[in-house]
Regions:
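Intrinsic disorder at enzyme termini
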Residues: 160, 221-318
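Long, amphipathic alpha-helical stalk/connector segments used for oligomerization, subunit docking
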Residues: 192-215, 219-220, 229
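Residue-level detector of conserved catalytic or cofactor/ligand-binding positions
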Residues: 385-390
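Conserved phosphate/anionic-ligand binding catalytic regions in large, soluble enzymes, centered on
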Residues: 143-164, 168, 203-205, 231-235, ...
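Generic beta-strand/beta-sheet core signal
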Residues: 37-42, 86-90, 127-131, 147, ...
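Helix-rich catalytic cores of soluble enzyme domains
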Residues: 1-154, 167-183
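Generic long, charged, amphipathic alpha-helical segments
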Residues: 320-375
């Protein structure tokens, strides 16, 4: 199913694929811990889908494997116990806990509809991968914090295995240091926080239980909609799935552009003094274009990063001078907003605590030779300032 979303078509005839999978299941029947079918859901998340969409589309793909392989003469028990689900985990802390809990509940409902002989066949095996969509190439050490909170969400949610993406994976081959930190996050959660010692630690929490029910209900509605269209493959080939993901991605992009959704280090609180290193290439900040009915994973911060990299590599960094005057509290508040605004584009910021008069500020601004001067003051103070064009 992964190749369908990446290329828009299967690499080989579907009938041959499922016959081959059925043969693999029979050959590995005695190896109870070997799972030969991987259902990948992180592709949806990393392409901009919502949590509900990722869950519904992943379940639909898993159900299609179940049905097609049962048509090859296998029982529901034989197939279900060979499926491994892989989903992304974002920084939406409690929502991600609820997503994995909802996934287990819904998958159990799907499998039990086919009346398995063993109840354990309805158990979902889940692998989580920390988000690549929200990683940033500027101020990359923030990615360590993202990966840690995401790993914690997944562990509390009760996943079986976990991959923490190294903090520098977005722009280079991970260094030994980045790989070590990624591994140690899991070890710390296990050996120091003991998250592996409690079964469903989120169980009983009204907030998380309520979130779980809400996500499960919405995902089930979307799952049924996919089934009504003929199943995962039919829904995908009709463009239904790709259109839904692209619409969600567009909404996320708008929220990031307007800073309704915050990506630290990219569209809010950037490192003012950071300059892109040689390891950062234009390809790392260029959003891939999806061709036809395909999904193209990207990172939410790419638009800001591309703009900033262009400024960094231009040879001359423009400067923005903060001319703060009038009411101190409002002047500093607007200066902070303006500093963040310009720094997101890689423009060098010259911040100033406060000027006693507009004349003093103008003199300092002219001496700085900044290309941009931002007057930071309250609305009332701004109405008293007269700025004339140079003659």
């Amino acid at each position: 199913m992964l190749e369908l979303s990446a290329k828009g078509q299967f690499a080989e005839d579907q009938a041959k694929t499922f016959k081959r999978l059925a043969d693999m299941i029979r050959r590995t029947a005695e190896y109870k811990h070997v799972r030969v079918i991987g259902v990948t859901g992180s592709q949806f998340h990393n392409s901009g889908s919502t949590i509900v969409q990722e869950l519904a589309f992943t379940l639909a793909a898993g159900h299609e494997y179940l049905v097609k392989l049962m048509d090859e003469g296998l029982t529901v028990d034989q197939v279900a116990r060979k499926i491994r689900f892989q989903m992304a985990v974002s920084s939406n802390y409690f929502m991600e806990m609820a997503k994995f809990r909802a996934a287990r509940m819904l998958w159990a409902n799907i499998v039990e509809a086919y009346k398995p002989e063993r109840q354990c066949s309805a158990k979902m095996f889940t692998h989580a991968e920390t988000s690549r969509w929200n990683q940033t190439v500027y101020d990359p050490y923030i990615n360590m914090l993202r990966g840690t909170t995401e790993a914690m969400s997944a562990a509390i949610a009760g996943i079986h295995s976990l991959e923490v993406v190294p903090f520098d994976a977005a722009f280079e081959k991970p260094t030994d240091f980045a790989d070590r930190i990624a591994r140690n996050v899991q070890l710390l959660l296990k050996h120091e926080s003991h998250f592996d010692q409690v079964v469903d630690p989120a169980g009983g929490s009204y907030y998380i239980e309520n979130l779980t029910d809400s996500i499960a209900n919405e995902a089930w509605k979307l799952f049924r909609e996919i089934e009504e269209k003929g199943g995962y493959t039919a829904a995908y080939e009709s463009g239904f799935i790709v259109e839904r993901v692209k619409a969600s991605a567009a909404a996320k992009d708008k929220n990031i552009a307007t800073r309704r959704e915050i990506l630290l280090g990219a569209n809010q609180y950037p490192n003012f003094t950071e300059v892109a290193g040689k390891e950062l290439t234009e390809a790392a900040v260029t959003r891939p274009v999806s061709e036809g009915n395909t999904l193209a994973p990207y990172r939410g911060s790419m638009a800001f990063e591309a703009m900033r990299l262009h400024v960094d590599r231009s040879g001359k960094a423009p400067k923005a001078f903060m001319l703060t005057c009038g009411s101190l509290a409002m002047a500093r508040a607007r200066a902070q907003f303006s500093c963040n605004f310009f720094a997101c584009a890689g423009i060098k910021v010259i911040d100033n605590t406060f000027f006693k008069s507009i004349e003093e500020g103008v003199k300092a601004a002219l001496e700085s030779k900044a290309e941009i001067v931002v007057v930071c003051a309250s609305d009332d103070d701004l109405s008293l300032i007269h700025i004339s064009e140079p003659t």
